[in-house]
């Protein structure tokens, strides 16, 4: 076995018909966690339904359908391997809640793979004013996904097939576009592929002898290659934030007979250890952690990315709930936010948003109505430069700095200190109407909260 490979998370983005599913399905299929039996079953079903030409996407559709129905499918199905990494696809758009998931997402993507269709007229549709290509790429950048790979797909259906001219034309236009958003095209590999036929996916295509490979330049080291798989292998692995203070948003709180209260959640930053004195915000409850478990095994420490359950002393299920955040009581403990300032981008709101608007915010695991108390300034969404002070209203496409006040106690952090607790989705009318990143938090000094005896005792040590 040797040393285990590093885990990397990617998000696959692009317009509806760009071939994301087929491309992703192909990778999972060829390098992934799907066993032969499942694949044969899928192929048979696809053929029976006359969808033989659709088999890679079919793999993904089956997985998606199961995800949508809430069946926890074996997450290994969304994984595949490169020479250096285990890669998990943390979300595939087309999924209704894609934007919300990308923000509150179970995890931050280390890299976005943008698939654009090279077919006649297809590329133009995707990148047009209302195409999703732009929105997805802008979202990825706004939410801190700083690495990007571009697959120019469906090279088999260009005019003529596998056209060098078409690839170069698309590369030029997409480069200009991503540059406007904030990416540096010199660091982005552009790979001409066919997700269906497999050209330049895992091995170099014989159909494009003109393609001499992609090259990228970056301060962490230059890289070059030919295939999409090689480009994925050149992702720079993330620095996991173990050195920051602990932040663990609660997903659920269970009461387990004979054990007691067990909060469950994902460590976003820092380290959680048995014996630690943790404070929950905004409940303002402090107690000792008795034990920490993952997959029914006791841990000596839980690190960022770990989904854990931990047992806390003398606290009832009524004291803490989903959306609370646990942190180290002695190291920048989490606190309730009285109000916060955020930079928001309005994605799709049919009308005008003015001060007083109070939609629901999804931030980490919290789901709470917040009021747009004050619209401070409208800004240019690319450069962040101020366009006007105190705008009367905001509409789709606008970016602004706003002051927000939670309707109920809530714990959030600035994006620069704790990224996963500093980005949010604004939900209204069953869709994501805006996204935001938090620039500043006005923390509320809560009155003295509940401190359990064991915590008080351990605190004196």
From Swiss-Prot:
Region (G4): 153-156
Keywords annotated in UniProt: Cytoplasm, Elongation factor, GTP-binding, Methylation, Nucleotide-binding, Phosphoprotein, Protein biosynthesis
InterPro entries (UniProt xref): EFTu-like_2, G_TR_CS, GTP-eEF1A_C, P-loop_NTPase, T_Tr_GTP-bd_dom, TRAFAC_GTPase_members, Transl_B-barrel_sf, Transl_elong_EF1A/Init_IF2_C
tr-type G domain: residues covered: 5-242
GO BP term (any one): translation
Xref: SUPFAM superfamilies: EF-Tu/eEF-1alpha/eIF2-gamma C-terminal domain, P-loop containing nucleoside triphosphate hydrolases, Translation proteins
Region (G2): 70-74
Pfam families: GTP-eEF1A_C, GTP_EFTU, GTP_EFTU_D2
Gene Ontology molecular function: GTP binding; GTPase activity; translation elongation factor activity
GO CC annotation, single: cytoplasm
Gene3D superfamilies: P-loop containing nucleotide triphosphate hydrolases (3.40.50.300), Translation factors (2.40.30.10)
Expression sites (tissue/organ): Oocyte.
Region (G1): 14-21
G3: annotated segments: 91-94
Binding site for GTP: 14-21, 91-95, 153-156
Location of N,N,N-trimethylglycine modifications: 2
Location within or outside the cell: Cytoplasm
Modified sites of kind 5-glutamyl glycerylphosphorylethanolamine: 301, 374
Residues covered by region (G5): 194-196
Annotated function: This protein promotes the GTP-dependent binding of aminoacyl-tRNA to the A-site of ribosomes during protein biosynthesis.
Family: Belongs to the TRAFAC class translation factor GTPase superfamily. Classic translation factor GTPase family. EF-Tu/EF-1A subfamily.
NCBIfam families recorded: EF-1_alpha, PRK12317.1
Protein name per UniProt: Elongation factor 1-alpha, oocyte form
